[in-house]
Amino acid sequence: MAVIYKTTAHASAGREGVVQTVDGFTVSLAFPKPGATHQDKNNPEQLFASAYAGCFSQAVRVVLQQHQLQLATQPIVGVSVELHDQDGLFHIKAGVELAITGVDQTTAQTVITAAHAMCPFSRLIKPENFLGLTLNGAKL
């Protein structure tokens, strides 16, 4: 397996600190507040959801290209990330939703399933921490 990209991030002060990558990305962190819809700082769950959504969206694009499908509207990927506390041990669970138009249900299901198999983030999540796939609002 050949490395095609590598970066390193450094963090200090935990969830109340700062994360910086060696290539210039910097973000201030804050612990997520239950019920808060907007904070001036981000949390690791938001960053994970954003990265996973971007990665899965790229996997969808690749699958569409492989099947020679051109859509009038770009599919939208949503990733939900939940932070769970089980006896003081935190767990992250994640699920993926795809909104796609311009193809039939069978093709859409093929796209989301193939993208899930291809996406590095999907392969990273253990089955017990995966909340599942949702296609156009329907859980698969």
Swiss-Prot record:
**Superkingdom of the organism of origin:** Bacteria
Any coiled-coil ranges, and where? none
Q: Which Pfam families match?
A: OsmC
The record's section on InterPro entries has: KH_dom-like_a/b (IPR015946), OHR (IPR019953), OsmC/Ohr_fam (IPR003718), OsmC/Ohrsf (IPR036102)
Q: Which GO terms describe its biological process?
A: response to oxidative stress
User: Which SUPFAM superfamilies does UniProt cross-reference here?
Assistant: OsmC-like
Concerning its family, UniProt says:
Belongs to the OsmC/Ohr family.
Give the protein name, as stated in the record: Organic hydroperoxide resistance protein-like
Upper taxonomic lineage: Bacteria, Bacillati, Mycoplasmatota, Mycoplasmoidales, Mycoplasmoidaceae
